[in-house]
């Protein structure tokens, strides 16, 4: 009986850990990619999250205008980029709240290639 209770508890703990961790699975542009200037930044997570902030900055740290962060809970978010992006390095920093109310943060960079490179 005790062994069965331990198995159930372990199963529950593993399930909760899986639910608790909703990492960023993919992004568009992809991390470290060299791309044409994107029209949007798309983030897809391993589970549903509430996205609380996303910033896009250039190599000087200047913020670029994105859509407002939606208030919905979802796996995928797409935020339009409203400023033209010149060739150079960019960084996306995001923050979300997972289903277990833990805060998840991350960042990735990408490069906008010059039009001659494409």
Question: Language-model segments: which ranges?
Answer:
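Short, surface-exposed alpha-helix to beta-strand junction/turn motifs within ectodomains of secreted
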Residues: 41-65
């Amino acid at each position: 009986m005790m062994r069965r209770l331990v198995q159930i508890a372990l199963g529950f703990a593993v399930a909760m850990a899986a639910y608790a961790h909703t990492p960023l699975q993919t992004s568009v542009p992809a991390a470290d990619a060299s791309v044409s200037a994107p029209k949007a930044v798309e983030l897809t997570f391993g589970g549903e999250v509430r996205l609380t902030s996303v910033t896009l900055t250039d190599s000087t740290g200047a913020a670029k205008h994105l859509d407002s962060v939606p208030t919905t809970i979802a796996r995928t978010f797409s935020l339009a980029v409203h400023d033209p992006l010149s060739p150079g390095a960019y960084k996306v920093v995001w923050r979300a709240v997972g289903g277990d109310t833990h805060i998840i943060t991350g960042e990735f960079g990408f490069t906008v290639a010059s039009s001659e490179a494409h």
